């Protein structure tokens, strides 16, 4: 936890608003890619970015920045995972626009998920269940629970990295963009729900209640 986070109490964001902040940039990306030619005709400045995928990338970067700023204004904190993901969006998005090569933005999920997976699984090698630092405010688990949950999420992130590589290398750009919204997100939600039995089994709050 940074000194800024420690100095000011965290303000909880409603689950619905949190979902909007997380899904908003992805929805902008999907809409801009599917309506890129229309946007280019309506807003000549966007046409300067290039084709639909480049317009979508530029607006995705702007929407990501807006979501991070909104999160900071409301909570005075920036969650680690959205922050890291945002930084990668800005770097790879800038490369995409500068070089006019959509490979960079397509590889962004691969880089982010590989990074998260490697950090989580690597932390276990040093006896650290780093996932606990991310979700500790949401729920409390015993040491074994955090270890198992960290392993599962670490492997899941690596799975998403491989899946992204398969999708963008094997299918069209439009399919890849749609899969980011309508494929990856439902898979992640289902995986999260599947962890509830583990969380309930190792919950310290449940133990204290008993």
Swiss-Prot record:
Lineage, broadest ranks: Bacteria, Pseudomonadati, Pseudomonadota, Alphaproteobacteria, Hyphomicrobiales
Biological role stated in the UniProt entry: Plays a role in cell envelope biogenesis, maintenance of cell envelope integrity and membrane homeostasis.
Family named by the database record: Belongs to the YciB family.
Annotated protein name in UniProt: Inner membrane-spanning protein YciB
Keywords: Cell inner membrane, Cell membrane, Membrane, Transmembrane, Transmembrane helix
Transmembrane stretches, start-end: 12-32, 53-73, 78-98, 115-135, 148-168, 175-195
Membrane-topology annotation of the record: Multi-pass membrane protein
Gene: yciB
GO cellular component: plasma membrane
UniProt KW Transferase keyword: no
Entry's localization field: Cell inner membrane
């Amino acid at each position: 936890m940074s000194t800024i986070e420690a100095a000011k109490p965290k303000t909880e964001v409603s689950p619905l608003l949190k979902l909007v902040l997380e899904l908003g940039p992805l929805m902008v990306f999907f809409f801009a890619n599917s309506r890129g030619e229309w946007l280019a005709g309506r807003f000549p400045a966007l046409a300067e970015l290039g084709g639909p995928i480049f317009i979508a990338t530029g607006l995705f970067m702007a929407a990501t920045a807006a979501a991070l700023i909104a999160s900071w204004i409301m909570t005075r904190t920036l969650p680690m995972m959205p922050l890291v993901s945002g930084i990668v969006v800005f770097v790879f998005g800038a490369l995409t626009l500068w070089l006019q090569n959509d490979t960079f933005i397509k590889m962004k999920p691969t880089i982010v998920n590989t990074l998260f997976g490697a950090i989580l699984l690597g932390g276990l090698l040093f006896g650290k269940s780093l996932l606990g630092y991310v979700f500790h405010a949401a729920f409390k688990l015993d040491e074994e629970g955090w270890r198992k949950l960290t392993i599962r999420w670490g492997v899941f992130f690596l799975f998403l990295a491989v899946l992204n590589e398969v999708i963008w290398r094997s299918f069209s750009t439009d399919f890849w963009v749609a899969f980011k919204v309508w494929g990856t997100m439902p898979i992640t939600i289902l995986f999260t729900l599947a962890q509830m039995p583990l969380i309930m089994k190792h919950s310290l709050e449940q133990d204290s209640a008993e």
